[in-house]
Amino acid sequence: MKRISTTITTTITTTITITITTGNGAG
């Protein structure tokens, strides 16, 4: 359960980072 939660958190963090990077690159 803890491992799954960590994976989800990592995925969300990565997605947010990519979104911010893409936004800055486009903007």
From Swiss-Prot:
GO terms for biological process: threonine biosynthetic process; transcriptional attenuation by ribosome. Keywords: Amino-acid biosynthesis, Leader peptide, Threonine biosynthesis. Belongs to the thr operon leader peptide family. This protein is involved in control of the biosynthesis of threonine. It comes from the Bacteria. This is thr operon leader peptide. Coiled coil: none annotated. It comes from Escherichia coli O157:H7.
